[in-house]
Swiss-Prot record:
It holds the Pfam family Aldose_epim. Its EC number is 5.1.3.3. GO terms for biological process: galactose catabolic process via UDP-galactose, Leloir pathway; glucose metabolic process. Mutarotase converts alpha-aldose to the beta-anomer. It is active on D-glucose, L-arabinose, D-xylose, D-galactose, maltose and lactose. It is found in: Cytoplasm. Transmembrane segments: none annotated. This is Aldose 1-epimerase. The gene is galM. GO terms for molecular function: aldose 1-epimerase activity; carbohydrate binding. It comes from the Bacteria. One of its GO terms (cellular component) is cytoplasm.
Length: 340
């Protein structure tokens, strides 16, 4: 179902909202502004439960938490808002101190075109011009959301560029499987990660070390444990909690994530073609508006952002995990979120 708001976005036109529903009654909603995943209501014990943090539609252009947004041209941080590519120093717009986060004034702040819409899917597309936020090359990207009959949402990202460039797309949804409307403490959830290595960062979120093995650290989620169990230990102290990338093991073959509600009545499995996963426990969510006009607290939701590693354009040793897109080559990644 396609509808539009009675009020306008910053570009002077109404927001376009698309709602999909499957035979189980699961209902998801998306928006053309930021190609945003607005809502996900999952059947649990004969009721529909909202599992995504969200705010009122007219708050999306101004809030600072990227709720449900499609993020690009480069998700995560690029140190000092610059990198070298093919012998040329590329200078980017900075939007987090001296660094660039999530592509600067990025794809989350644009109106995407509704390219195609069907009973169980919607495809958004966007053109990013050469020099957009400092990035080289014209880029055409698309994001396709599909709601399946087994209560999964699959997100597919595709892109083409006419110059070598940095390209790393993700979705910035925050999950809370217990109470996404008010935002109960997500650290009460249980988390399992199919990941052996994580990437330490400094207090500005910039990598400051090679990849580390998770063994004997608070980043070892290979056996499911409550998120709160080892919270704020070790390398987490620099970032007020988890805000780190993990290298995931063959994530397309088996889930890289299993997130379970505190009571165990709902779980989320994540599979992806991406090499890495940023786990962010909402350490700075305080003050973000809710759908009912109240404010979320810190740790109200967890973002599970499938992507390549942060600051990859400045680290050739990580570029085998993605991050640099060659001119004329096809960019394609997918992630599937399954509720059960």
């Amino acid at each position: 179902m396609l509808e539009q708001t009675t009020f306008n976005a910053p570009d002077g036109a109404p927001y376009q909202l698309i709602t999909l529903q499957n035979e189980n009654g699961m209902r998801v909603q998306f928006m053309d502004w930021g190609a945003t995943w607005l809502s996900c209501k999952v059947p649990v014990n004969d009721t529909l439960r909202e599992v995504l943090l969200g705010c009122k539609v007219d708050n999306y252009p101004t809030h600072q938490s990227y709720l449900g947004a499609s993020v690009g041209r480069y998700a995560n941080r690029i140190a000092n808002a610059q990198f070298e590519l093919n012998g040329e120093l590329i200078k980017l717009s900075s939007n987090q101190g001296k660094h660039q986060l999530h592509g600067g004034e990025g794809f989350d702040k644009r109106r995407w075109n509704i390219q195609e819409c069907g009973e169980n899917f919607v495809c958004f597309s966007l053109h990013s011009v050469d020099g957009d936020q400092g990035f080289p090359g014209n880029v055409d990207v698309s994001v396709t959301y599909t709601l399946t009959g087994d209560n999964s949402v699959k997100i597919e990202y595709a892109g083409m560029c006419d110059k070598d460039t940095a390209l790393n797309l993700t979705n910035h949804t925050y999950f809370n499987l217990e109470n996404a409307e008010q935002g109960s403490d997500v650290r009460e959830h249980t988390l399992r990660l199919n990941a052996d290595f994580y990437l330490p960062v400094d207090n500005e979120g910039i990598p400051n070390s090679p990849l580390k093995h998770v063994v004997n650290t608070s980043f070892d989620f290979r056996i499911a444990k409550p998120i709160k169990q080892d919270f704020l230990q070790g390398d987490q102290q620099a970032t007020k909690g988890y805000d780190h990338s993990f290298i995931v093991n063959k994530a397309w073959q088996k889930p890289c994530v299993l997130l379970t509600s505190p009571t165990g009545d709902l779980s989320l499995e994540v599979r992806t073609s991406q090499a890495a996963l940023q786990v962010y426990t909402g350490n700075y969510l305080a003050g973000t508006p809710t759908r009912n006009g109240e404010l979320y607290a810190d740790f109200s939701g967890i973002a599970l952002e499938t992507q390549c590693l942060p600051d990859t354009p400045n680290h050739p040793e990580w570029q085998n995990y993605g991050g640099i897109q060659k001119a004329g080559g096809r960019y394609y990644q997918w992630t599937e979120f399954k509720f059960k």
